[in-house]
A protein has these predicted regions:
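Active-site acidic-Proline motif in GNAT/NAT acetyltransferases
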Residues: 69-72, 105
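Short glycine/proline-centered loop/turn elements that form peptide/ligand docking sites
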Residues: 83, 106-107, 128-131
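C-terminal "cap" of GNAT-fold acetyltransferases
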Residues: 33, 116, 122-139
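Conserved GNAT acetyl-CoA-binding A-motif
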Residues: 90-102
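Acetyl-CoA-dependent GNAT
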Residues: 2-69, 89
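Conserved active-site alpha-helix within GNAT-family acetyltransferase domains
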Residues: 80, 104-122
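Conserved acetyl-CoA pyrophosphate-binding loop and the N-cap/start of the following alpha-helix
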Residues: 72-85
Length: 139
């Protein structure tokens, strides 16, 4: 069973080296949560704290990326466990909510958000086409 833990700089370096596209989504600071099995990272999420504008005027953790790989490990609870760990961090940080954006084509991700209790706010283009959703969990 995978270990879920806070990531460190060496984890970030390993993730970027293995999956170069992540260099664009893993920012400095923030919160890196990793799932590792036998000292191999098999999943991660990265979130950052930001201020929500009026009328809420509180802080949230925005989940910029969540990944589980290899593909055969998906839909087995790793992402759920990483989100649970982030929720613990968010509670300790006393943030208002956890939030993320999910592309409409990412059906398995939408299922994850619904399963873990996140509310769904569709995003529509001016022509009415829905392109994705902001999902959030108020703490």
């Amino acid at each position: 069973m995978a270990n879920i833990r806070l990531g460190i700089d060496v984890d970030r370096t390993q993730i970027v080296a293995t999956y170069p596209y992540t260099a664009n989504v893993l920012g400095d600071g923030g919160y890196l949560v990793v799932a590792d099995e036998n000292e191999q990272i098999v999943g991660f999420l990265w979130a950052f704290k930001r201020k929500i504008p009026a009328p809420i005027e509180q802080e949230e953790l925005f989940i910029n990326v969540i990944e589980v790989f290899p593909e055969e490990l998906r839909c087995q609870g790793l992402a759920t466990r990483m989100l649970e760990r982030l929720k613990e961090i968010a509670a300790a940080e006393k943030v208002y909510q956890l939030r993320a954006y999910c592309d409409i084509r990412n059906v398995s991700s939408h299922r994850l958000w619904v399963k873990t209790g996140y509310g769904n706010n569709p995003v529509a283009l001016p022509d009415g086409n829905i392109v994705g959703s902001f999902v959030s969990l108020v703490l």
